[in-house]
A protein has these predicted regions:
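ATP-dependent phospho-/nucleotidyl transfer catalytic cores
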Residues: 474
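Bacterial Sec-dependent N-terminal signal peptides
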Residues: 1-23
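Extracellular attachment/recognition segments
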Residues: 706
Length: 761
């Protein structure tokens, strides 16, 4: 063979390898185990591997924790107790409607401890659309491929006459029935952690493709010999097979919050598909969603981090609706227990996700955002209030009235197609009342706030300063929406004035926000490093920046841009000192700030996540460009310890996605995104309207992190923000990056992002 021919073959092989590498798709970069190495005292994400489709009604997960444990999967665990259908948004909120399936061989073991099998991450494969693990105790493999409301299981058994599958419907009221002639198990679970009506049930159906050689039901881990149907506090089923070596047994699983019949209907999502076809359909669904944003980088870890964060950004809020036999969208109402028409979504806390998760959906996936807004309207119609934390119904968690932000942002961006007047009515209701049973829904302390302009420190309402600051922003959101709707001026003026209530807590002596008593005096003594008390999971240094809608007003209160920048610098330069006396010990959020090595900047919790972007409002955008990259480099990794605190239903992930693209919605409702700097050399967003937005930064790297200049659609662009409706037109942003800050760019007030005070002048 001559040298020329050898060279041709070598080139062909190289091209083939290059082509194979190029065929790697977005979902291939996702690590569902990112953030799973967590515990109650330290959160590296507090996530679990959600085996699901985007926004799916049901997720599946390997269960390592005990029944009812919020930390249901932890990376440090070495035993699996079952494979659980889960709807858990957070370990702190816990789960509802859960049940589990556990295969085994040799001896039938029902108890959750005795049935657990050793496993290794080396024999575990986790992707969003497919999960596989070898259970060493039983010499068998379990595989799962999900749909939105179903899952396809494939069990590969050894040769044995003692192959079993145990179904656990969990405690606190459950039902199960084995139907041997149909190779089927049906049942329901009522297990929940609150936020459900009295008639709440999750009905399930499991169909196997192999006849049973053994079938029993059980109660409280004891087999029942006399019948195959049982309802009690804690029941389940056990079925068995004889299998050859390598034989695969399949199970199709569906569930419904509506009825057993609807659970059977939901099985149609799998229909006649094989396991492999279901798996491939899931892969395609994920690539369709993740592929809306294409980033390019030679560092695979950055690609993995980006797409793992994007995956987390499209899980919640989850669908809580189904499709009936007539093809109509219907839902079980977690608010009144009725079956209603239309969409419903749940499992999100607006205190976290109003900040950038919902704006992200509104920009990249507006048709899904439209459905979510209809779901919010249905929540108001069915319960009298918008949710603040829903799982599946109203939950007593966190502070604020941030449904106003979620509703207003979608409306201002023309995402909402639901009855906007009715939604505005709901905002007014929530701003001037409190839910009779769930005081975190609506506004706790609204009477004081409306009268005094703040929630006082001395009236036994906890976290009062945090409430005041968030209520003021929420009032601005109501004002914005009302203005666009053409509401009466006298009505708008109420919320316009209230939006300035943040000023009532500003202490000119310390230049920080501070709790205030009902007589108008500031709380004393005052320690700005004290967590909790007047604030929520943070201190005054963190919450002072919660003036999303009027940063210029805050700049003015502090004495001008120079002092404002100095105060921002202080957060990042101060040591991570803290006062934990309010909690009586170090909470995990404090520990996560302490170990991050970024001063008093607590990125692991939401109140401060927008802070670095505020340099853009004071003429020093290069500091934002520096610190945003530091945050991404230091605090995010595509590993089990990859987050710097609770991931929180997409918020902390969507922060990374936005920031990596180079912009962030500091003030939802303003239709603006504040500039950072792109993280990748190239990113392409395919918008839902078919337009493409290309973000190019050819010289971008860790040294060249500063924007020297920006060319936007062929023109020099100096502003520190981008407009939502301009982005929807598509186009090209070309960044010239440098290793030195350009201190002459973005320094004029005309370049600064929206602030109410400046806009009102």
């Amino acid at each position: 063979m001559n040298k020329k021919k050898l060279l041709s073959i070598a080139i062909a092989l190289l091209l083939g390898a290059s082509s194979t590498f190029a065929q790697k798709q977005p979902v291939d970069y996702v690590n569902p185990l990112m953030g799973t190495d967590s515990k109650i005292s330290l959160s590296n994400g507090n996530t679990y591997p959600a085996i699901a489709l985007p926004w799916g009604m049901n997720f599946w997960m390997p269960q390592t924790g005990k029944m009812g444990d919020g930390w249901a999967y932890t990376y440090a665990s070495d035993k699996i107790r079952g494979f659980k259908q889960t709807h858990q948004p957070s370990p702190w909120i816990n789960d509802y409607g859960q049940f589990s399936i556990m295969p085994m061989t040799k001896q039938l073991k029902i108890d959750q401890d005795s049935r657990a099998s050793w496993f290794s991450h080396k024999a575990e494969k986790a992707t969003p659309y497919y999960y596989s693990v070898y259970l060493s105790e039983y010499d068998m493999t379990t595989e799962i491929a999900p749909t939105e409301r179903c899952a396809y299981f494939r069990f590969t058994f050894p040769e044995t006459s003692d192959a079993y599958v145990v179904v656990d419907a969990f405690d606190r009221g459950s039902y199960v029935k084995v139907i041997p002639e149909e190779n089927k198990i049906v049942g329901y679970t009522t297990r929940n952690s609150g936020g459900v009506p009295q008639n709440f049930k999750n009905y399930f159906v499991i169909e196997f493709d192999k006849p049973f050689t053994f079938n029993k039901v059980w109660a409280d881990y004891h087999l029942v010999e006399t019948h195959l149907e049982l309802q009690s506090n804690h029941v389940g089923a056990a079925i068995g097979f004889s299998t050859k070596k390598g034989e695969q047994v399949h199970a199709k699983v569906a569930s419904s919050f509506i009825s057993p019949e609807q659970a059977e209907l939901n099985l149609k999502e799998i229909g006649n598909k094989t396991f492999e076809q279901t798996k491939e359909a899931g892969r395609k669904a994920w690539n369709n969603v993740l592929g809306r944003i294409k980033v390019e980088d030679s560092d695979e870890n950055r690609m993995r981090t980006f797409y793992s964060c994007l995956y987390r950004s499209v899980l919640f809020p989850r669908m809580f609706y189904e499709v009936n036999g007539k093809g109509e969208t219907v839902h079980y109402s977690p608010y009144n227990g009725e079956i209603r028409s239309g969409y419903m979504f749940t499992d999100t806390g607006f205190w976290d996700t109003f900040r950038c998760l919902f704006p992200f959906v509104n920009l990249i996936y507006p048709s899904m955002g439209e459905k979510m807004q209809e779901g919010l309207l249905n929540t108001y119609l069915e319960s009298g209030f918008f949710p603040e934390w829903a799982s599946p119904g109203h939950r007593g968690c966190m502070v604020g009235n941030n449904s106003a932000s979620v509703v207003a942002d979608a409306f201002m961006k023309n995402v909402t197609k639901a009855d906007a007047e009715k939604m505005y009515e709901g905002l007014l209701k929530g701003a001037n009342s409190v839910h009779p049973k769930v005081s975190t829904t609506g506004r706790r302390g609204y009477e004081y706030y409306n009268k005094l302009g703040y929630v006082p420190y001395d009236v036994k309402i906890n976290e009062n300063a945090a409430r005041t600051l968030e209520y003021a922003y929420d009032d601005w959101c109501i004002y914005r929406m009302g203005e666009k709707l053409g509401r009466p001026a006298e009505e708008l003026d109420v919320y316009k004035k209230r939006s300035q209530n943040y000023r009532n807590l500003f202490d000119p002596e310390t230049k920080l926000m501070r709790g205030k008593n009902s007589d108008g005096t500031f709380q004393t003594p005052f320690n700005p490093f004290k967590w909790g008390d007047a604030f929520t999971e943070g201190n005054s240094w963190h919450y002072t920046w919660s003036v999303f809608h009027d940063v210029q007003g805050l700049v003015d209160l502090m004495g001008g841009k120079k002092m404002f920048v100095s105060m921002l610098d202080s957060v990042l330069n101060l040591p991570p000192v803290f006062d934990d006396s309010y909690y009586g010990g170090v909470i995990h959020e404090i520990r996560e700030m302490e170990i991050a090595n970024m001063g008093n900047y607590a990125h692991g919790n939401q109140p401060i996540q927008h802070m670095i972007y505020l340099y853009n409002y004071a003429g020093e955008p290069w500091k934002a460009q520096y610190w945003l990259r530091e945050t991404m480099n230091r605090l995010y990794l595509p590993t089990p310890d990859g987050y710097c605190g609770d991931e929180d239903n997409g918020q902390t992930s969507a922060w990374y996605v936005f920031t990596a693209l180079g912009f962030y919605p500091v003030c939802p409702g303003s239709n603006e995104y504040v500039m950072g700097a792109p993280y990748f050399k190239k990113a392409t967003i395919t918008l839902e309207n078919g337009k493409k937005l290309e973000i190019s930064a050819p010289k971008n790297n860790d040294d060249n992190r500063y924007i020297r200049s920006l060319n936007y659609n062929g023109k020099n662009y100096t502003k520190n923000y981008l407009n939502h409706f301009d982005l929807l037109k598509g186009g090209r942003l070309v960044f010239d990056m440098d290793n030195k800050p350009n201190k002459g760019r973005g320094i004029n007030e005309s370049d600064f992002p929206y602030s109410f005070s400046r806009d009102a002048k």
